[in-house]
């Protein structure tokens, strides 16, 4: 009887330990209403396509949606985590197709995007790297790929706070 209690206690302890390991391994939640607090380096005319200065992010285990709230134009991007997603926009009267791959790994979300303008020439145009600081600040590293490699890429770091 005593041996059975010991086995049950050990089994219960193992379940509790396993549950705490799984809980601590949960991916971060980027969901919320976000407001831009800083941008580095400052670049005249720079405007993050999906975020702008204010955005709403909704997230499930398998999807992520970014809704640009401000400044206009309102834009929405929908991603399926671990798969390719396509979003279409009209920019300056021209159709723009953005094919993205969103991957959540450890505490980082990576979104790599190919852009296809009206001329049909698709290229890797952008890589976003998201993470959360311990204080809850959303850090977005935005790497813009210049054309088809004929000039240097530009990396901009954006910081957002929850509204």
Located regions from the model:
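Bacterial N-terminal signal peptides that target proteins for export
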Residues: 1-12
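Intrinsically disordered, low-complexity regions enriched for glutamine and histidine
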Residues: 2, 24-25
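N-terminal signal peptide c-region/cleavage motif recognized by signal peptidases
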Residues: 18-20
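Hydrophobic small-molecule pocket/channel-lining residues, especially in calycin-type beta-barrels
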Residues: 25-163
